[in-house]
Structures are given as structure tokens and as C-alpha cells.
Amino acid sequence: SARTKGLIPVHLYGQAANMDPLMELAQKHHLRVIEDTAQAFGSDYHGKKLGTIGHVGCFSFYPTKILGAYGDGGLIITDDDQIAEVARTLRAHGAKRNYYNEMVGYNSRLDAIQAAILSVKLPYIDQWIAGRREAARNYNRLLKDMPGVIIPYEAPYTKHVYNQYTIRVLNGKRDQLWRQLHEAGIGTMIYYPIPVHKLPVYERTAPSLEVSERYAGEALSLPIWPQMEMETQRLVVEKISEIVNG
């Protein structure tokens, strides 16, 4: 609409959104593109690193992310000097120099301890991504023929880094599977139980989005980490089969 100022593609679970059509749309309507790369550090789109395609790339260093700090942290990258200046000002209470606030800002500075931890972990990131991708391939082999389960799809234009390995559980059995896996000591997560348009803050924007609502009732993220052993994955999949097809 005439009120639209920008687009925010989300590289969900570790896989790139299809950026070319979005960038073409943005160029046509003079919009800014802000990439949400929180779950996809190290992934790419047609060989170009995510976060470097749009006007701004946003990264999360929360401990559960591909590259995680010990606490909260994040990064914004851009090649636009004006955006960079505003971002630097916003992160420091809206001030370019001490005690001289020019806009309403935040305390969003990355502290030295988090930066040090990230600096130590960064050299291992390619190795850890390779480990996640191998674990995902193992899950794919173990789950691909299981009735009632749809495994993740890796788009041909990207390298999925599997911040989450998220399956779809059909026939209304997702919540039962989540509950019984939890009872068996297998940690899984539901990302995300409520679609954005159903949250109170946005519920007036769209009365119904059927695909989003269906997927929200089917998505289940299985345990995955770079050093995950095949035997552990077999145990997870055996329990899933027992519950879904029992």
C-alpha cells in the first residue's frame, strides 16, 4: 500500500527466503529491505551471504543461535552510511556523544565479554554448520519414509544451516507428539505456536491466513546440534515413530 516503507524477509530456521523477487519488488516501489538473519548466520543465497543482500542485515547472538554469546547480543550490518549513523545513535540512548541525546534511543551496546566470547567461537562456525548439516542429513534419511511426518525442504538457491530442524506432524498429532517426547526426556520446541496475525498486537491486520495457521499446528523442532551422534538421532526417530504410528 501507499503506507508501506519496507520489507522484512525472515530467513527462518536457517534457510534463506527467496530474495530476488523481494528485491525486485523493493526496487519497483522504492522500499528498504531489512533481512532478519537471526536464525541463519553463515547461510547464503545464490552464494551471497545472508544479511548482505538487503539494505540492512540483522543478526542475533542469543545463546540458542548458530553463533551464540553467553547472553543477549546482536549485530546490524549495512553499506548505507546514513543508516549506519542512525543505528549507532539509536544503540547509545539516541546520542552521538555523551549526554547529548538527539533522538529516543536504547541501551543496545554489545558488551566486551559477549564480544570476546563471540570472537573465540567465530573461527569454528563453518565446522559447526557442517556438523548441523550432517545431523540434518541423518534425520532426513531416518524420517523420509515415515507416514504422518514431512521433513524440511532445502531450497536449491540456499545452504540451510539448520538453526532448527523443523518437521511437520500431520493428522493433528503434533501436540501429542510434543507432549510424549517431553515425557520421554526428549526436548523439542514448537516454533511458533501462534501465527503473528493471531497475536493481540496484530490481530486486526488479517482475520485468517489458512496456511500459516495450519503450519503453526504442525511444526515441531527436533533436537539438533553440531556434535549430535547418529545413535542419539536413531533414538529420537524411533520414539517419534512409536508415537505417531503407534
Spans of model-derived segments:
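Active-site phosphate-binding strand-loop segment of PLP-dependent enzymes
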Residues: 1-69, 75-77, 225
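PLP-dependent aminotransferase class I/II
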Residues: 6-10, 15, 19-21, 28, ...
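Acidic, glycine-centered active-site loop in nucleotide-sugar glycosyltransferases
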Residues: 53-54, 72, 165, 181
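Short glycine-enriched loop/turn motifs at secondary-structure junctions
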Residues: 67-71, 158-161
